[in-house]
Swiss-Prot record:
Keyword RNA-binding: no
Domain Peptidase S8, first and last residues per copy: 111-417
Name by which UniProt lists this protein: Tk-subtilisin
A Pfam short name: Peptidase_S8
UniProt family annotation: Belongs to the peptidase S8 family.
Temperature-dependence annotation: Thermostable. Highly active at 80 degrees Celsius.
Positions annotated as active site in the UniProt record: D139 (charge relay system), H177 (charge relay system), S348 (charge relay system)
pH influence on activity: Optimum pH is 9.5.
UniProt lineage: Archaea, Methanobacteriati, Methanobacteriota, Thermococci, Thermococcales
Quaternary structure and interacting proteins, as annotated: Monomer.
Signal peptide coordinates: 1-24
InterPro entries xrefs: Peptidase_S8/S53_dom, Peptidase_S8/S53_dom_sf, Peptidase_S8/S53_subtilisin, Peptidase_S8_Asp-AS, Peptidase_S8_Ser-AS, Peptidase_S8_subtilisin-rel, S8pro/Inhibitor_I9_sf, Subtilisin_Carlsberg-like
Length: 422
């Protein structure tokens, strides 16, 4: 088995200093996100200034628009337009993570990170294989026929360039990062390769980044909306006010984002709020800059920011400080395209460990009580919410309680599931 080590945040979104062209052939056309008053906004008026609607959000009052650069002022003055925000380019820092690998399937090994979060001792209770529990992974897509993943890929969708597509070719991972992240969450317990934290959980692969690890903030916001709507495209189909954890709905119960950046765009936050209010636990990488605080979207209070540790329980030097919790993120072995396996490191790799633990908590709780736990808040220290359970059961390696290096500590699946079950 070939192993390659790469430092990956995986994907840090940098706010561009200028608007990104809508396409290479339309250098005078830019993409913007328009927050609107739906009662007053007329989408057809956009055509009158030479623009067109790329995507109309269902869950927030906003639209993605391609418009001539010299018409932005006119757009801002249209009835019903409340705010116009320029889209931001997303880039992968460092070399592309297409490292290749052999197709020979090795005998299964349990990666050190899976052991460190104490996942194997939970599998006799649950491996995450509860029909109402799905984890949406917003990333570069997935190798959907990888023998260590295929059985757990329940749905894939791409939102690249504002176009929603469920065609397999559009969902395919041409970078490797997404396949690696998904393997840490849900690689099968099948005697080959590796095994994930929750080896039975269903995965929604939401491709928001292209082969270069490049995408946009608007693509990510659309991806979050798709995770809420689910394969049937309808949030709260039965109208009972319950979305996550409802067997009549197919929204994800967990959203995992191994990406981040410095820009705080209001429409992205609005979509985060929609997911949080739907009862979805949102987990994101804190960042790889060694900065004193997390990047966005991890910095939002509704999101669990994840820092990275190495196998000696040291905080990785690259890991941004002030995470909510920490998890293994150095020398992480997982699945990779072409039926292979690779070793990567970054807060990107720490994040899926936490997402997998959350999936185990919710699966175990649902099996016993027929419902899922509320998400909770950053300050929770009770057994009544997912975040509270993560906090009180974490391995508190720094000063007692929360600290700026480890957060509440390193997540532990076994104690977390025990706490959830009472």
């Amino acid at each position: 088995m070939k192993k390659s080590i790469a430092l990956v945040l995986s994907i840090v979104l940098l706010a561009a200093l200028f608007a990104v062209p809508a396409s290479a052939g339309e250098q005078n056309t830019i993409r913007v996100i328009v927050s609107v008053d739906k009662a007053k906004f007329n989408p057809h008026e956009v055509l009158g200034i030479g623009g067109h609607i790329v995507y109309q959000f269902k869950l927030i009052p906003a639209v993605v628009v391609d418009v001539p650069a010299n018409a932005v002022g006119k757009l801002k003055k249209m009835p019903g337009v409340e705010k116009v925000e320029f889209d931001h380019q997303a880039v992968l820092l460092g070399k592309p993570s297409w490292l290749g690998g052999g197709s020979t399937q090795p005998a299964q090994t349990i990666p050190w990170g899976i052991e460190r979060v104490k996942a194997p001792s939970v599998w006799s209770i649950t491996d995450g294989s509860v029909s109402v529990i799905q984890v949406a992974v917003l990333d570069t897509g997935v190798d959907y026929d990888h023998p260590d993943l295929a059985a757990n890929i329940a749905w894939c969708v791409s939102t690249l360039r504002g176009k929603v597509s469920t065609k397999l070719r559009d969902c395919a991972d041409q970078n490797g990062h997404g396949t690696h992240v998904i393997g840490t969450i849900a690689a099968l317990n099948n005697d080959i390769g590796v095994v994930g934290v929750a080896p039975g959980v269903q995965i929604y692969s939401v491709r928001v980044l292209d082969a270069r690890g490049s995408g946009s903030y608007s693509d990510i916001a659309i991806g979050i909306e798709q995770a809420i709507l689910g394969p049937d495209g309808v949030a709260d189909k039965d109208g009972d006010g319950i979305i996550a954890g409802d067997p009549d709905d197919d929204a994800a119960e967990v959203i995992s984002m191994s990406l981040g950046g410095p820009a705080d765009d209001s429409y992205l936050y609005d979509m985060i709020i929609q997911a949080y209010n739907a009862g979805i636990v949102i987990v994101a990488a804190s960042g790889n800059e060694g900065a004193p605080s997390p990047s966005y979207p991890a910095a939002y209070p509704e999101v669990i920011a994840v820092g990275a540790i190495d196998s000696n329980d040291n905080i990785a030097s690259f890991s941004n400080r002030q995470p909510e919790v920490s998890a293994p993120g150095v020398d992480i072995l997982s699945t990779y395209p072409d039926d292979s396996y690779e070793t990567l490191m970054g807060t990107s790799m720490a994040t899926p460990h936490v997402s997998g633990v959350v999936a185990l908590i919710q699966a175990a709780y649902y099996q016993k009580y027929g419902k899922i736990l509320p998400v909770g808040t950053f300050d929770d220290i009770s057994k009544n919410t997912v975040r509270g359970i993560l906090h009180i059961t974490a391995d508190d390696l720094g000063p007692t309680g929360w600290d700026a290096d480890y957060g509440y500590g390193v997540v532990r699946a076994a104690l977390a599931v025990q706490a959830a079950l009472g």
